[in-house]
Amino acid sequence: MSDRKAALEMALRQIEKQFGKGSIMKLGESADQRVSVISSGSITLDIALGAGGYPRGRVIEVYGPESSGKTTVSLHAIAEVQKQGGQAAFIDAEHALDPAYASKLGVNIDELLLSQPDTGEQALEIAEALVRSGAVDILVVDSVAALVPKAEIEGEMGDSHMGLQARLMSQALRKLSGATNKSKTIVIFINQIREKIGVMFGNPETTPGGRALKFYSSVRLEVRRAEALKNGTDIVGNRTKLKVVKNKIAPPFKQAEVDIMYGQGISKFGELIDLGTDLDIVQKSGAWYSYNSERLGQGRENAKQYMIEHPDVADEVERLIREHHGLVDRKEPVDFEEGQDEDLFAE
Protein backbone atom coordinates (compact mmCIF):
# COMPACT_ATOMS: atom_id res chain seq x y z
CA MET A 1 0.00 0.00 0.00
CA SER A 2 1.37 3.41 -0.99
CA ASP A 3 1.97 6.15 1.56
CA ARG A 4 -0.96 8.15 0.14
CA LYS A 5 -3.39 5.21 0.53
CA ALA A 6 -2.14 4.46 4.03
CA ALA A 7 -2.58 8.11 5.01
CA LEU A 8 -6.12 8.09 3.57
CA GLU A 9 -7.05 4.88 5.44
CA MET A 10 -5.76 6.38 8.67
CA ALA A 11 -7.74 9.59 8.06
CA LEU A 12 -10.93 7.59 7.36
CA ARG A 13 -10.50 5.54 10.55
CA GLN A 14 -9.96 8.73 12.53
CA ILE A 15 -13.09 10.34 11.04
CA GLU A 16 -15.23 7.26 11.79
CA LYS A 17 -13.85 7.09 15.33
CA GLN A 18 -14.66 10.76 15.93
CA PHE A 19 -18.00 11.09 14.11
CA GLY A 20 -19.33 7.51 14.02
CA LYS A 21 -19.57 4.65 11.52
CA GLY A 22 -20.93 5.71 8.14
CA SER A 23 -19.93 9.36 8.55
CA ILE A 24 -17.74 8.96 5.45
CA MET A 25 -17.80 6.26 2.76
CA LYS A 26 -17.27 5.72 -0.94
CA LEU A 27 -20.37 6.59 -2.93
CA GLY A 28 -20.67 3.10 -4.42
CA GLU A 29 -20.63 1.46 -0.98
CA SER A 30 -24.12 2.66 0.02
CA ALA A 31 -26.56 -0.26 0.18
CA ASP A 32 -29.19 1.25 -2.15
CA GLN A 33 -28.35 4.21 -4.34
CA ARG A 34 -31.92 4.72 -5.57
CA VAL A 35 -33.97 7.46 -3.95
CA SER A 36 -36.78 6.00 -1.86
CA VAL A 37 -40.13 7.64 -2.64
CA ILE A 38 -43.69 7.71 -1.34
CA SER A 39 -46.63 8.20 -3.72
CA SER A 40 -48.09 11.71 -3.78
CA GLY A 41 -51.60 10.23 -3.81
CA SER A 42 -51.99 11.21 -7.47
CA ILE A 43 -50.78 8.87 -10.21
CA THR A 44 -50.50 11.81 -12.66
CA LEU A 45 -48.29 13.75 -10.24
CA ASP A 46 -46.21 10.62 -9.51
CA ILE A 47 -45.44 10.42 -13.24
CA ALA A 48 -44.59 14.14 -13.45
CA LEU A 49 -42.24 13.84 -10.46
CA GLY A 50 -40.27 11.27 -12.44
CA ALA A 51 -39.32 8.99 -9.56
CA GLY A 52 -42.88 7.89 -8.75
CA GLY A 53 -43.58 10.16 -5.79
CA TYR A 54 -42.02 12.46 -3.20
CA PRO A 55 -38.43 11.59 -2.23
CA ARG A 56 -37.94 10.55 1.40
CA GLY A 57 -35.50 12.56 3.48
CA ARG A 58 -35.94 15.69 1.36
CA VAL A 59 -37.57 19.12 1.61
CA ILE A 60 -40.50 19.85 -0.74
CA GLU A 61 -42.08 23.26 -1.44
CA VAL A 62 -45.69 23.44 -2.67
CA TYR A 63 -46.73 26.96 -3.64
CA GLY A 64 -49.39 28.80 -5.61
CA PRO A 65 -52.23 31.34 -5.48
CA GLU A 66 -55.01 31.25 -2.89
CA SER A 67 -57.50 28.35 -3.08
CA SER A 68 -55.49 26.60 -5.80
CA GLY A 69 -55.30 23.25 -3.98
CA LYS A 70 -51.94 23.41 -2.14
CA THR A 71 -53.25 22.02 1.15
CA THR A 72 -55.30 19.38 -0.71
CA VAL A 73 -52.18 18.14 -2.53
CA SER A 74 -50.30 17.94 0.80
CA LEU A 75 -53.15 16.15 2.60
CA HIS A 76 -53.21 13.49 -0.14
CA ALA A 77 -49.50 12.85 0.56
CA ILE A 78 -50.28 12.48 4.28
CA ALA A 79 -53.10 10.02 3.52
CA GLU A 80 -50.75 7.97 1.33
CA VAL A 81 -48.09 7.75 4.07
CA GLN A 82 -50.71 6.73 6.63
CA LYS A 83 -52.06 4.00 4.31
CA GLN A 84 -48.54 2.52 4.28
CA GLY A 85 -48.42 2.55 8.10
CA GLY A 86 -46.32 5.71 8.49
CA GLN A 87 -46.63 8.53 11.03
CA ALA A 88 -47.69 12.00 9.83
CA ALA A 89 -47.62 15.46 11.43
CA PHE A 90 -49.23 18.76 10.38
CA ILE A 91 -48.03 22.14 11.66
CA ASP A 92 -50.98 24.46 11.07
CA ALA A 93 -49.49 27.95 11.30
CA GLU A 94 -52.51 29.37 9.45
CA HIS A 95 -54.91 27.81 12.01
CA ALA A 96 -57.18 26.83 9.13
CA LEU A 97 -57.07 23.03 8.83
CA ASP A 98 -60.52 21.47 8.36
CA PRO A 99 -60.51 18.01 10.01
CA ALA A 100 -63.72 16.94 8.23
CA TYR A 101 -62.24 17.73 4.81
CA ALA A 102 -58.94 16.03 5.69
CA SER A 103 -60.88 12.93 6.72
CA LYS A 104 -62.73 12.88 3.36
CA LEU A 105 -59.37 12.83 1.56
CA GLY A 106 -58.41 9.65 3.42
CA VAL A 107 -56.41 11.20 6.28
CA ASN A 108 -56.71 9.29 9.57
CA ILE A 109 -57.27 12.32 11.82
CA ASP A 110 -57.12 10.15 14.96
CA GLU A 111 -53.46 9.36 14.20
CA LEU A 112 -52.43 12.71 12.66
CA LEU A 113 -50.21 14.84 14.92
CA LEU A 114 -51.39 18.48 14.84
CA SER A 115 -49.71 21.62 16.14
CA GLN A 116 -51.07 25.17 15.91
CA PRO A 117 -48.10 27.28 17.05
CA ASP A 118 -48.21 30.93 18.14
CA THR A 119 -44.95 32.05 16.50
CA GLY A 120 -42.71 31.08 13.61
CA GLU A 121 -39.89 30.13 16.00
CA GLN A 122 -42.21 27.79 17.90
CA ALA A 123 -43.43 26.16 14.68
CA LEU A 124 -39.93 25.49 13.38
CA GLU A 125 -38.63 24.24 16.74
CA ILE A 126 -41.55 21.77 16.87
CA ALA A 127 -40.75 20.73 13.28
CA GLU A 128 -37.10 20.15 14.17
CA ALA A 129 -37.99 18.13 17.28
CA LEU A 130 -40.36 15.89 15.28
CA VAL A 131 -37.83 15.34 12.49
CA ARG A 132 -34.99 14.61 14.95
CA SER A 133 -37.17 12.01 16.72
CA GLY A 134 -36.78 9.83 13.62
CA ALA A 135 -40.35 8.60 14.14
CA VAL A 136 -42.25 10.96 11.80
CA ASP A 137 -42.41 9.98 8.12
CA ILE A 138 -44.06 13.09 6.70
CA LEU A 139 -44.31 16.61 8.12
CA VAL A 140 -46.36 19.40 6.51
CA VAL A 141 -45.92 23.07 7.46
CA ASP A 142 -48.90 25.22 6.38
CA SER A 143 -47.71 27.82 5.53
CA VAL A 144 -44.34 29.60 5.32
CA ALA A 145 -46.10 32.97 4.96
CA ALA A 146 -47.85 32.38 8.31
CA LEU A 147 -44.57 31.71 10.19
CA VAL A 148 -44.53 35.10 11.89
CA PRO A 149 -41.36 35.89 13.91
CA LYS A 150 -41.88 36.47 17.64
CA ALA A 151 -40.48 40.03 17.37
CA GLU A 152 -43.17 40.92 14.83
CA ILE A 153 -45.99 39.49 16.96
CA GLU A 154 -44.80 41.35 20.06
CA GLY A 155 -44.12 44.61 18.17
CA GLU A 156 -46.51 47.38 17.17
CA MET A 157 -48.72 47.05 14.09
CA GLY A 158 -46.81 49.61 11.99
CA ASP A 159 -43.28 48.48 12.92
CA SER A 160 -40.89 47.46 10.13
CA HIS A 161 -39.38 43.97 10.44
CA MET A 162 -37.29 43.75 7.28
CA GLY A 163 -35.83 40.32 6.57
CA LEU A 164 -36.81 38.71 9.90
CA GLN A 165 -38.82 35.90 8.32
CA ALA A 166 -36.13 35.20 5.72
CA ARG A 167 -33.47 34.93 8.45
CA LEU A 168 -35.73 32.63 10.47
CA MET A 169 -36.29 30.29 7.50
CA SER A 170 -32.60 30.32 6.55
CA GLN A 171 -31.53 29.31 10.06
CA ALA A 172 -34.26 26.67 10.38
CA LEU A 173 -33.42 25.03 7.05
CA ARG A 174 -29.71 24.89 7.86
CA LYS A 175 -30.62 22.86 10.95
CA LEU A 176 -33.41 20.84 9.35
CA SER A 177 -31.79 19.67 6.12
CA GLY A 178 -29.27 17.25 7.66
CA ALA A 179 -31.73 15.86 10.21
CA THR A 180 -34.36 15.40 7.48
CA ASN A 181 -31.98 13.32 5.38
CA LYS A 182 -30.98 11.09 8.31
CA SER A 183 -34.54 10.50 9.54
CA LYS A 184 -35.91 9.95 5.99
CA THR A 185 -38.75 12.38 6.78
CA ILE A 186 -40.56 14.08 3.90
CA VAL A 187 -40.89 17.75 4.92
CA ILE A 188 -43.44 19.70 2.86
CA PHE A 189 -43.55 23.48 3.18
CA ILE A 190 -46.72 25.04 1.76
CA ASN A 191 -46.13 28.59 0.54
CA GLN A 192 -48.15 31.48 -0.82
CA ILE A 193 -47.17 33.92 -3.57
CA ARG A 194 -46.56 37.66 -3.50
CA GLU A 195 -45.84 40.22 -6.22
CA LYS A 196 -42.64 42.24 -6.40
CA ILE A 197 -43.27 45.96 -6.79
CA GLY A 198 -41.93 47.75 -9.87
CA VAL A 199 -41.14 44.70 -12.02
CA MET A 200 -41.54 45.77 -15.65
CA PHE A 201 -40.30 42.63 -17.39
CA GLY A 202 -40.39 38.98 -16.37
CA ASN A 203 -42.50 37.30 -13.73
CA PRO A 204 -43.33 39.65 -10.83
CA GLU A 205 -44.41 36.76 -8.59
CA THR A 206 -42.26 35.58 -5.70
CA THR A 207 -42.71 33.46 -2.56
CA PRO A 208 -42.36 34.73 1.03
CA GLY A 209 -39.61 33.56 3.38
CA GLY A 210 -36.53 34.52 1.40
CA ARG A 211 -34.44 32.38 -0.93
CA ALA A 212 -33.31 29.65 1.48
CA LEU A 213 -36.32 27.40 0.87
CA LYS A 214 -35.78 27.58 -2.91
CA PHE A 215 -32.20 26.33 -2.45
CA TYR A 216 -32.89 23.61 0.13
CA SER A 217 -35.95 22.15 -1.66
CA SER A 218 -35.35 19.01 -3.71
CA VAL A 219 -38.76 19.47 -5.35
CA ARG A 220 -40.70 22.71 -5.91
CA LEU A 221 -44.29 22.27 -7.03
CA GLU A 222 -46.43 25.09 -8.44
CA VAL A 223 -50.20 24.60 -8.06
CA ARG A 224 -52.64 26.67 -10.15
CA ARG A 225 -56.32 26.48 -11.06
CA ALA A 226 -56.83 26.08 -14.81
CA GLU A 227 -60.62 26.08 -15.13
CA ALA A 228 -63.82 25.40 -13.20
CA LEU A 229 -65.53 22.01 -13.51
CA LYS A 230 -69.30 22.21 -13.80
CA ASN A 231 -72.21 19.86 -13.33
CA GLY A 232 -74.89 21.72 -15.23
CA THR A 233 -74.65 25.26 -13.88
CA ASP A 234 -73.09 24.24 -10.54
CA ILE A 235 -69.31 24.47 -10.10
CA VAL A 236 -68.25 21.15 -8.51
CA GLY A 237 -64.47 21.42 -8.68
CA ASN A 238 -61.41 22.77 -10.46
CA ARG A 239 -59.14 21.53 -13.19
CA THR A 240 -55.74 22.11 -11.58
CA LYS A 241 -52.26 22.34 -13.12
CA LEU A 242 -49.31 21.02 -11.12
CA LYS A 243 -45.92 22.09 -12.47
CA VAL A 244 -42.65 20.63 -11.17
CA VAL A 245 -40.59 23.85 -11.18
CA LYS A 246 -37.51 22.27 -9.55
CA ASN A 247 -36.55 18.61 -9.29
CA LYS A 248 -33.23 17.23 -8.00
CA ILE A 249 -34.16 13.57 -8.49
CA ALA A 250 -35.55 13.62 -12.05
CA PRO A 251 -35.88 16.02 -15.01
CA PRO A 252 -37.87 19.12 -13.97
CA PHE A 253 -40.57 21.24 -15.69
CA LYS A 254 -43.00 18.38 -16.21
CA GLN A 255 -46.69 19.17 -15.73
CA ALA A 256 -49.66 17.25 -14.41
CA GLU A 257 -53.34 18.15 -14.70
CA VAL A 258 -55.82 16.80 -12.18
CA ASP A 259 -59.45 17.33 -11.20
CA ILE A 260 -59.81 18.60 -7.63
CA MET A 261 -63.45 18.03 -6.69
CA TYR A 262 -64.98 20.02 -3.84
CA GLY A 263 -65.26 17.87 -0.72
CA GLN A 264 -63.47 14.92 -2.38
CA GLY A 265 -59.98 16.08 -3.36
CA ILE A 266 -58.07 14.80 -6.39
CA SER A 267 -60.28 12.63 -8.60
CA LYS A 268 -58.44 9.35 -9.08
CA PHE A 269 -61.00 8.20 -11.66
CA GLY A 270 -60.55 11.35 -13.76
CA GLU A 271 -56.80 10.64 -13.80
CA LEU A 272 -57.38 7.06 -14.94
CA ILE A 273 -59.59 8.21 -17.83
CA ASP A 274 -57.07 10.86 -18.98
CA LEU A 275 -53.92 8.72 -18.61
CA GLY A 276 -55.66 5.62 -19.97
CA THR A 277 -56.78 7.54 -23.06
CA ASP A 278 -53.26 8.95 -23.62
CA LEU A 279 -51.79 5.42 -23.54
CA ASP A 280 -54.69 3.91 -25.55
CA ILE A 281 -55.52 1.63 -22.62
CA VAL A 282 -58.91 3.36 -22.64
CA GLN A 283 -60.17 3.90 -26.18
CA LYS A 284 -61.99 7.08 -27.19
CA SER A 285 -64.21 7.18 -30.25
CA GLY A 286 -65.99 10.49 -30.66
CA ALA A 287 -67.52 11.21 -27.26
CA TRP A 288 -67.60 7.52 -26.22
CA TYR A 289 -65.01 5.89 -23.95
CA SER A 290 -64.45 2.13 -23.89
CA TYR A 291 -62.13 -0.43 -22.30
CA ASN A 292 -61.60 -3.97 -23.67
CA SER A 293 -64.49 -3.39 -26.12
CA GLU A 294 -66.78 -2.55 -23.20
CA ARG A 295 -68.33 0.91 -23.29
CA LEU A 296 -67.64 3.06 -20.22
CA GLY A 297 -69.94 5.93 -21.14
CA GLN A 298 -70.56 8.91 -23.36
CA GLY A 299 -68.51 11.89 -22.23
CA ARG A 300 -65.72 12.07 -19.65
CA GLU A 301 -68.01 12.49 -16.63
CA ASN A 302 -70.05 9.38 -17.50
CA ALA A 303 -66.85 7.38 -18.02
CA LYS A 304 -65.63 8.56 -14.59
CA GLN A 305 -68.94 7.46 -13.05
CA TYR A 306 -68.55 4.00 -14.63
CA MET A 307 -65.09 3.68 -13.03
CA ILE A 308 -66.54 4.66 -9.63
CA GLU A 309 -69.25 2.00 -9.95
CA HIS A 310 -66.82 -0.68 -11.24
CA PRO A 311 -63.69 -0.54 -9.01
CA ASP A 312 -62.33 -3.77 -10.54
CA VAL A 313 -62.09 -2.05 -13.95
CA ALA A 314 -60.48 1.01 -12.33
CA ASP A 315 -57.89 -1.19 -10.55
CA GLU A 316 -57.04 -2.98 -13.81
CA VAL A 317 -56.59 0.32 -15.71
CA GLU A 318 -54.45 1.74 -12.87
CA ARG A 319 -52.24 -1.38 -12.85
CA LEU A 320 -51.63 -1.09 -16.61
CA ILE A 321 -50.81 2.64 -16.34
CA ARG A 322 -48.37 2.02 -13.47
CA GLU A 323 -46.71 -0.84 -15.35
CA HIS A 324 -46.27 1.35 -18.43
CA HIS A 325 -44.59 4.15 -16.45
CA GLY A 326 -42.59 1.80 -14.22
CA LEU A 327 -44.26 3.00 -11.02
CA VAL A 328 -44.39 0.95 -7.83
CA ASP A 329 -47.81 -0.45 -6.97
CA ARG A 330 -49.39 1.67 -4.21
CA LYS A 331 -50.34 -1.47 -2.35
CA GLU A 332 -46.71 -2.48 -1.81
CA PRO A 333 -45.80 -1.87 1.86
CA VAL A 334 -43.06 0.64 2.65
CA ASP A 335 -40.45 -0.13 5.29
CA PHE A 336 -40.40 3.23 7.06
CA GLU A 337 -37.66 2.07 9.46
CA GLU A 338 -35.32 1.17 6.58
CA GLY A 339 -32.23 3.36 6.61
CA GLN A 340 -33.04 4.92 9.98
CA ASP A 341 -30.58 4.59 12.84
CA GLU A 342 -31.78 5.30 16.36
CA ASP A 343 -28.26 6.46 17.31
CA LEU A 344 -28.11 9.10 14.55
CA PHE A 345 -29.68 11.77 16.72
CA ALA A 346 -28.00 10.94 20.01
CA GLU A 347 -26.41 13.98 21.59
UniProtKB/Swiss-Prot annotation:
Pfam families: RecA, RecA_C. It comes from Exiguobacterium sibiricum (strain DSM 17290 / CCUG 55495 / CIP 109462 / JCM 13490 / 255-15). ATP binds at G64, P65, E66, S67, S68, G69, K70, T71. InterPro entries: AAA+_ATPase (IPR003593), DNA_recomb/repair_RecA (IPR013765), DNA_recomb/repair_RecA_CS (IPR020584), P-loop_NTPase (IPR027417), RecA-like_C (IPR049261), RecA-like_N (IPR049428), RecA_ATP-bd (IPR020588), RecA_C_sf (IPR023400). GO terms for molecular function: ATP binding; ATP hydrolysis activity; ATP-dependent DNA damage sensor activity; damaged DNA binding; single-stranded DNA binding. Its main location: cytoplasm. It is found in: Cytoplasm. GO terms for cellular component: cytosol. This is Protein RecA. PROSITE patterns: RECA_1, RECA_2, RECA_3. GO terms for biological process: DNA recombination; DNA repair; SOS response. The keyword DNA repair applies. SUPFAM superfamilies: P-loop containing nucleoside triphosphate hydrolases, RecA protein, C-terminal domain. It comes from the Bacteria. The gene is recA. Keywords: ATP-binding, Cytoplasm, DNA damage, DNA recombination, DNA repair, DNA-binding, Nucleotide-binding, SOS response. Belongs to the RecA family. Can catalyze the hydrolysis of ATP in the presence of single-stranded DNA, the ATP-dependent uptake of single-stranded DNA by duplex DNA, and the ATP-dependent hybridization of homologous single-stranded DNAs. It interacts with LexA causing its activation and leading to its autocatalytic cleavage. The keyword Cytoplasm applies.
